[in-house]
Amino acid sequence: MKTVCLVLGIIIFLWGPGAEAKDFKFPEVTGWKQSGEIQTFIPKTLFEYIDGAADLYLMYDFQELKVAEYLNEKKASVIVDVYRHKTPTQAFGIYSQERLSDANFINIGAQGYVEKNVLNFLTGSYYVKLNSFNTGAEDEEILLNFAKKVSENLGEKGRLPFILSSFPEEGKKKNSEKFINKNFLGYSFLYSAFTADYELSGTKFKLFVIESDRKGCKDMIQKYLQQTKSPEKNIAEGLYTISDPYHGEIELHWQGKYIWGILNVSDTSLRSKYLKLFEVGLEKKK
């Protein structure tokens, strides 16, 4: 009986609600002091801090937010927001929704960028946002110093989702990749998807990839055909061209656990080219 209780205790410890959370501590920064208490927000209270944006964060499996404010003798301040999401992919998702593709990117965490009075970065399951006030000409230096110390306290920096390396490089707009967690293209039956924007010879288009198991992929194809009133043939792996009333003609390919496709392109040769390039990229990922 004691052995059973011990095993159950270990299981509860490993899989309990706090198993994924690190014991994060805000860093000490020379010349700065924390002002007031650290604020903590959970899913049901997040709206108290970011009312208008809370729903978007919750879509990406937000778990917890910790907020600290620092002041110096010159009455400048830095506010550090540390958002924890359920997985690194979810953290990337919300980060990708807010980053600007032409931002001033820096080597911090998995990726980060700095603008006037703002520094945001991604590291593991954490999305960190820093805002500065009255920091003057030293603003960027101050933000970088804070970011490095916060990143060190969070530990391993992680990396961007590996599947992003499968996207063809030719024509891809740098840092345009996004992760859509739910309702891709506005359809509840389409699971989460990674996307990237492209431009080639004046033609702008988008590539996407959805990852599931074989049954999940088959169900998505079948429901998409039903939704668009497309002819329902024997659902099998291969190429599909779907006339979507909201998104135009979409060409996609299903193979194994992936569905990948292309949007906003009428040139069939260009579609074929990029679907093949994408297939090659996914093969390398295996």
Task: Locate the predicted segments by residue.
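Soluble, non-membrane globular domain cores that form compact, hydrophobic packing
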Residues: 9, 13-286
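Positively charged n-region of N-terminal signal peptides that target proteins for export
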Residues: 1-5
